[in-house]
Amino acid sequence: MARVKNGIVHVARRKRILKKTKGFWGTKKSNYKKAKDTLRKGMMYATRDRKTRKRDLRSLWIVRISAALTGMGINYSRFFEGLRKLNIKLNRKILSNLAIEDIESFKKIVYEIKN
């Protein structure tokens, strides 16, 4: 029986892993064994952090809205209660952008809620 060395597949597999680890630091980009482990760990972090990014952004929006409301004499919970009562359908992301970029529109919304 002939010996099968599997050379082309072997090289292609290593090349694929090393291509994905381009930009990593030290031997983690050039040593196949370390590159493979680092890449696997990086993919795990990427999967986990796609979930946490959503939580982080939501909390950032809440902090921004709260910060904008403190100078206007209303707190966050009263603000959102007023939004629901007036049936204003703006989400936290939009409100956060309004509070930063278009403060006059945000003040008008707060004025409507207060009165």
From Swiss-Prot:
InterPro entries: Ribosomal_bL20, Ribosomal_protein_bL20_C
GO biological process, one term: translation
GO CC annotation terms, alphabetical: ribonucleoprotein complex; ribosome
A Pfam family of this chain: Ribosomal_L20
Molecular function via GO: rRNA binding; structural constituent of ribosome
Assigned keywords, A-Z: Ribonucleoprotein, Ribosomal protein, RNA-binding, rRNA-binding
Role noted for this protein: Binds directly to 23S ribosomal RNA and is necessary for the in vitro assembly process of the 50S ribosomal subunit. It is not involved in the protein synthesizing functions of that subunit.
Family designation: Belongs to the bacterial ribosomal protein bL20 family.
Protein's name in the database: Large ribosomal subunit protein bL20
Species of the source: Borrelia duttonii (strain Ly)
